[in-house]
């Protein structure tokens, strides 16, 4: 009779630099399905915690899956601590969340985790919706972000629409967007990266605005017309990777934007509807 082998030696536990909490698809390149390989290309280790598990994005003619049950979700988080797999943890990132209850569970886990990791970087991408689609998450998620995750985050990466929802302010011009972002800053929340600020349509530019208490930096990139999904998830993966590799915030944002453009163009060259990662020149 065979006996079950138990891995009880926690000194042998696999360690990660980042825990990435967001969506996962079986087919496609969104959420952790693009973030994890992008982070690994940067030479960092990552644990992926799914919030929803889907066959693909809803942009296909068939679509299956849904939110991870709370019991499973909390268990995924708890298991990382039970296995002593977080000794070297440096950052937690969040993307698409399936339910408001997941946000509350995650916030409780992060609060406890920070007691052992006081320097932990928490970066929140408050995925709520966009100008074209409006809110495409459950209606109680914006308040859950405000109540539970924003007070824990050091940095957030909303688009213009999400910034408006979180602050209740109109952000359709640069000055109002900057003012809204500054209204969110606190002793904990040190910076806001607005990922779709008003750009120059005539010059085919888009702007990313980095807002902190003492500075505002506007970074312009070429605009690529595309229907590709997952570019925001890729941007956040590149941003957190750059920060953990020692890049200053503005430099990390700039490099993340350039990498997203590179990936989009590479994907278009290969005539794919899903992002394809080319080799990273500098790991």
UniProtKB/Swiss-Prot annotation:
Pathway info: Cofactor metabolism; pyridoxal 5'-phosphate salvage; pyridoxal 5'-phosphate from pyridoxal: step 1/1; Cofactor metabolism; pyridoxal 5'-phosphate salvage; pyridoxine 5'-phosphate from pyridoxine: step 1/1; Cofactor metabolism; pyridoxal 5'-phosphate salvage; pyridoxamine 5'-phosphate from pyridoxamine: step 1/1
Pfam families assigned: Phos_pyr_kin
EC numbers: 2.7.1.35
Cofactor(s) required, per the database record: Mg(2+)
Keyword Nuclease: no
GO BP: pyridoxal 5'-phosphate salvage
Gene Ontology MF term list: ATP binding; hydroxymethylpyrimidine kinase activity; magnesium ion binding; pyridoxal kinase activity; zinc ion binding
tRNA-binding keyword on record: no
Residues the record lists as binding substrate: 23, 59, 233
Annotated positions binding Mg(2+): 136, 162
Positions bound to ATP: 125, 157, 162, 195, 221-224, 231
InterPro entries, per the entry: PdxK, PM/HMP-P_kinase-1, PyrdxlKinase, Ribokinase-like
Catalyzed chemical reaction(s): pyridoxal + ATP = pyridoxal 5'-phosphate + ADP + H(+); pyridoxine + ATP = pyridoxine 5'-phosphate + ADP + H(+); pyridoxamine + ATP = pyridoxamine 5'-phosphate + ADP + H(+)
Keywords of this entry: ATP-binding, Kinase, Magnesium, Metal-binding, Nucleotide-binding, Transferase, Zinc
Coiled coil ranges: none
One term under GO cellular component: cytosol
Top EC category: transferase
Residue intervals passing through the bilayer: none
Primary role: B6-vitamer kinase involved in the salvage pathway of pyridoxal 5'-phosphate (PLP). Catalyzes the phosphorylation of pyridoxine (PN), pyridoxal (PL), and pyridoxamine (PM), forming their respective 5'-phosphorylated esters, i.e. PNP, PLP and PMP.
Quaternary structure (record): Homodimer.
Family: Belongs to the pyridoxine kinase family. PdxK subfamily.
Name by which UniProt lists this protein: Pyridoxine/pyridoxal/pyridoxamine kinase
Source organism per UniProt: Shigella boydii serotype 18 (strain CDC 3083-94 / BS512)
């Amino acid at each position: 009779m065979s006996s079950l082998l138990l891995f009880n030696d926690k000194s042998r536990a696999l360690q990660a630099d980042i825990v990435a909490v967001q969506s996962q698809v079986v087919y496609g390149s969104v959420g952790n399905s693009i973030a994890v390989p992008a982070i690994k290309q940067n030479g960092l280790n990552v644990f992926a915690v799914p919030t929803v598990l889907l066959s693909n994005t809803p942009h296909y003619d068939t679509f299956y899956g849904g939110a991870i049950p709370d019991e499973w979700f909390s268990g995924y988080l708890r298991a990382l601590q039970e296995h002593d797999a977080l000794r070297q943890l440096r950052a937690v990132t969040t993307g698409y969340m399936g339910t408001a209850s997941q946000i509350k569970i995650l916030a409780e886990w992060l609060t406890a985790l920070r007691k052992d990791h006081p320097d932990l970087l928490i970066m929140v991408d408050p995925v709520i919706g966009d100008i074209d689609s409006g809110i495409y998450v459950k209606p109680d998620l914006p308040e859950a972000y405000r109540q539970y995750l924003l007070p824990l985050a050091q940095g957030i990466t909303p688009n213009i629409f999400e910034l408006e929802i979180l602050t209740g302010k109109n952000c359709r011009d640069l000055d109002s967007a900057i003012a809204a972002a500054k209204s969110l800053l606190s002793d904990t929340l040190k910076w806001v990266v607005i990922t779709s600020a008003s750009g120059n349509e005539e010059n085919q530019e888009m702007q990313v605005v980095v807002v902190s208490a003492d500075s505002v930096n506007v970074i312009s990139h070429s605009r690529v017309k595309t229907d590709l999904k997952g570019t925001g998830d890729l941007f956040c993966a590149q941003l957190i990777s750059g920060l953990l590799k020692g890049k200053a915030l503005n430099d990390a944002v700039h490099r993340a934007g350039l990498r997203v453009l590179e990936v989009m163009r590479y994907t278009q060259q290969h005539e794919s509807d899903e992002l394809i990662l080319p080799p990273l020149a500098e790991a």
